[in-house]
């Protein structure tokens, strides 16, 4: 009886003339529907806010790019749909935008004290949530309902401007697109500001599901099919991790890893790999800086598990499958949707902690070569299709595993973004000095996005885990050798 007077939410009326489009199969998943992403870029120059806003609005109204202006609705069957305006006005713009202006330098704002700065040694340099006053504007979306019950575009822009700095935050529902698509949007936005709209590519059409056949006819089983965790196994895993998943507070902290540190780790690893004989049909062992950085973070993350040497560490890594799916996605057209899947590495704790970093990095590189082909992507997506209505990704390992999730955006090069076209004064490139990403309303525990390398070559990454587990990383970092990364 306590809900008798509770107000029922009502979705905005359907606007006649809006183009109604079904969500693509791989976008319409439980996980992607749940999360709103907030991607913040800090520039140490004053930018023309009106130019920024106008350019993004024009992009959202542009033919082929109007998905950015889409509104989310449920149809009579309860399925999500994009309702894409065909006409725009000041009352119904393409892009939801907010702006806060401060008549001071950034250094005089209280939150500036929390802005992470590069470090001489690998270190935790900040907490992402401390910057909430910068990345969340008035009426900022934080959950799916904020899109369903308001006439809000799936993409939003929040700008905080100072005399000497500008903070831009793109927010969007993850069901709209992934990190690779975000970079395509940033590049197109920049071309509008540069007056080079004729160079903006036309995206793959949002009117049809370009990946509708992906995973429907795999030619081979997945490489880890025999290690796929059953539904019962995942229930057992969830129950054994219920405290961390649902009761302990999760924190998203920022880690800076100096350029020289990663370069040294990589050089040592390449020397060590000479002693690793390649497998049948394999080339001479090689690892990238990304491989060794992922291995290094994984070792930090499980440094407290030495008493469980045989426990499986499941390292799942997101990758964009666009390049290997050319039968579905043309190379000259950006795909403004989700096309990121996972490759997986399963190694025991004793190997992650007891063997050289190069060993774990090599396992990651082998998994990339083995599991990110077109054939294996088809097999992975076939498993995803078989997971039921929620379309949860397949998990590999066992019910007692420690799962770590990574996503490396270094090749996307967000730090290479040049917004000099919007600079109010000065010449030369205007690149972000700091970038972070936050997800709401929930946080995935043990998730580590690698944002990329700044102009000085420093790697920036964030991690979401419990406060207790961050204490473990703090301790492990204090014990790190400054040259080799060994403990």
UniProtKB/Swiss-Prot annotation:
One of its GO terms (biological process) is terpenoid biosynthetic process. Disulfide bonds: none annotated. Pathway: Secondary metabolite biosynthesis; terpenoid biosynthesis. Its EC number is 2.3.1.-. GO terms for molecular function: acyltransferase activity. InterPro entries: CAT-like_dom_sf (IPR023213), Sec_Metabolite_Acyltrans (IPR051283). The active site is at residues 174, 418. Signal peptide: none annotated. Keywords: Acyltransferase, Transferase. The keyword Repressor does not apply. Disruption phenotype: Impairs the production of neosartorin and accumulates deacetylneosartorin and novofumigatin A. The keyword Transferase applies. Acetyltransferase; part of the gene cluster that mediates the biosynthesis of the tetrahydroxanthone dimer neosartorin, which exhibits antibacterial activity. The two different monomeric units appear to be synthesized by the same set of enzymes, among which the Baeyer-Villiger monooxygenase nsrF is the key enzyme for the divergence of the biosynthetic routes. The pathway begins with the synthesis of atrochrysone thioester by the polyketide synthase nsrB. The atrochrysone carboxyl ACP thioesterase nsrC then breaks the thioester bond and releases the atrochrysone carboxylic acid from AacuL. Belongs to the plant acyltransferase family. Monomer. This is Acetyltransferase nsrL. It comes from Aspergillus novofumigatus (strain IBT 16806). The gene is nsrL.
């Amino acid at each position: 009886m306590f809900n008798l007077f509770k107000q029922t939410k009502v979705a905005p009326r359907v606007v006649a003339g809006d183009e109604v489009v079904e969500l693509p199969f791989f976008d319409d998943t439980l996980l992607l529907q749940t999360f709103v992403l907030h991607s913040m870029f800090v520039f140490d120059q004053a930018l023309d806010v009106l130019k920024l806003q106008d350019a993004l609005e024009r992009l959202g109204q542009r033919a082929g790019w109007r998905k950015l202006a889409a509104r989310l609705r449920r149809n009579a069957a309860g399925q999500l749909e994009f309702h894409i305006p065909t006409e725009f006005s000041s009352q119904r713009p393409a892009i939801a935008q907010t702006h806060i202006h401060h008549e001071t330098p950034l250094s005089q704002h209280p939150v500036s004290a929390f802005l992470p700065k590069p470090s001489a040694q690998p270190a935790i340099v900040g907490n992402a949530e401390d910057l909430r006053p910068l990345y969340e504007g008035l009426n900022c979306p934080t959950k799916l309902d904020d899109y369903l019950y308001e006439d809000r575009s799936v993409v939003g822009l929040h700008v905080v401007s100072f005399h000497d700095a500008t903070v831009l935050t793109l927010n969007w529902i993850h069901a709209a697109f992934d990190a690779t698509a975000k970079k395509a949007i940033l590049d197109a936005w920049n071309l509008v500001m540069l007056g080079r709209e004729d160079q903006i590519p036309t995206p793959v059409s949002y009117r049809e599901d370009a990946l509708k056949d992906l995973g429907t006819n795999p030619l081979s089983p997945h490489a880890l099919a025999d290690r796929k965790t059953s539904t019962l196994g995942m229930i057992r895993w969830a129950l054994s991790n219920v405290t961390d998943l649902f009761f302990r507070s999760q924190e998203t902290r920022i880690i800076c890893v100096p350029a020289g540190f990663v370069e040294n780790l990589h050089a040592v690893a390449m020397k060590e790999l000479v002693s690793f004989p390649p497998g049948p049909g394999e080339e001479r062992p090689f690892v990238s800086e990304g491989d060794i950085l992922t291995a290094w973070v994984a070792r930090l993350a499980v440094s407290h598990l030495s008493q469980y040497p045989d426990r499986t560490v499941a390292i799942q890594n997101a990758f964009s499958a666009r390049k290997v799916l050319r039968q579905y996605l043309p190379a000259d057209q950006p795909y403004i949707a989700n096309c990121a899947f996972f490759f997986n590495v399963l190694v025991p704790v004793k190997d992650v902690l007891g063997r050289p970093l190069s060993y774990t990095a090599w396992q990651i590189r082998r998994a990339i070569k083995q599991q990110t082909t077109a054939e294996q992507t088809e097999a992975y997506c076939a498993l995803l299709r078989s997971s039921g209505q929620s379309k949860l990704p397949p998990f590999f390992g066992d019910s007692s595993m420690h799962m770590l999730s990574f996503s490396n955006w270094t090749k996307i090069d967000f730090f290479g973004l040049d917004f000099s076209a919007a600079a109010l004064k000065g010449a030369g490139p205007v690149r972000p000095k700091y970038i972070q990403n936050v997800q709401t309303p929930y946080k995935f525990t043990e998730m580590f996005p690698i944002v990329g390398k700044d102009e000085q070559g420093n790697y920036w990454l964030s991690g979401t885990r419990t406060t207790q587990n961050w204490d473990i990383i703090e301790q492990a970092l204090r014990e790190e050798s400054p040259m080799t990364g060994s403990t």
